[in-house]
Amino acid sequence: MRIALGISYSGSAYEGWQSQLSGNTVQDKLESALARFAAQPVRTLCAGRTDAGVHGLMQVVHFDTVLHRDMGSWVRGTNAFLPSDIAVQWAREVPDTFHCRGSAIARRYAYVVLESPVRPSVEAGRVGWVYRPLDGAAMRQAITHLVGEHDFSSFRAAQCQAKSPVKTINRIEISERAGTGSKYWHFEFEANAFLHHMIRNIMGCLVAIGQGSHEPGWLLDVMAARSRDAAAPTFSPNGLYFLGPVYEDHYGLPNRTAAYDWLP
């Protein structure tokens, strides 16, 4: 049988999602916990690999097993062996044709950025940080150039293994919430797929525009160049959240977890 799990995690202490020799990745911790609960090795595939420091609100994985246990047992049993900053949120039996990555029709990410003259402390690692004010109108104008199908080579990491740089961004939304002498900015992205570091590189450009270093139309020049050298520096992974994949309704998989309501 094939089982899908929804996983949430804080990425601050880990070297990203994908398994490494060090064993200090989210995938390594999850597979170790699953193996202890199932008393046999378990290999997982994920909907989207995240970098070191990036958090996941609803990563989705799947694996095949001959064990027949109720779905609640997979949640409680696996969580019993996971560190406190990783948790299985739900488990569902899915058809053998389901693939957590291949069946996804879209992926969603969010950036939470603190605008403040003082760096974050309690929120360290959970928010990005800028100390110069951001111009929301300029950034909102800039994102209109990104929505749709484009060649995103200028936002692609050198080590990206994607076959094509052409992706379709369905939507980008920017909102803000005033704090005491500060602001929390919330950027949400949805696309059919993302290139390696694509969101972090886009964020670097949006921050540069928001701080007045470039005009919104500069993004058109960046995209036309199809060169990473044309774009702004990569933004910090702090404050970046993988909100999860989007699947067709007939799979019956949840699309939110409680952590969504926690985001600033």
Curated annotation (Swiss-Prot):
Organism of derivation: Polaromonas sp. (strain JS666 / ATCC BAA-500)
Catalysed transformations (reactions): uridine(38/39/40) in tRNA = pseudouridine(38/39/40) in tRNA
Quaternary structure, from the entry: Homodimer.
Xref: Pfam families: PseudoU_synth_1
Homology family: Belongs to the tRNA pseudouridine synthase TruA family.
Enzyme class: isomerase
EC id: 5.4.99.12
Active-site residues (renumbered): D51 (nucleophile)
InterPro entries to which the protein is assigned, alphabetical: PsdUridine_synth_cat_dom_sf (IPR020103), PsdUridine_synth_TruA (IPR001406), PsdUridine_synth_TruA_a/b_dom (IPR020097), PsdUridine_synth_TruA_C (IPR020095), TruA/RsuA/RluB/E/F_N (IPR020094)
Keywords linked to the UniProt accession: Isomerase, tRNA processing
Protein name (Swiss-Prot/TrEMBL): tRNA pseudouridine synthase A
Role according to the record: Formation of pseudouridine at positions 38, 39 and 40 in the anticodon stem and loop of transfer RNAs.
Domain of life: Bacteria
Gene Ontology BP terms: tRNA pseudouridine synthesis
Residues annotated to bind substrate: Y109
MF term (GO), any: tRNA pseudouridine(38-40) synthase activity
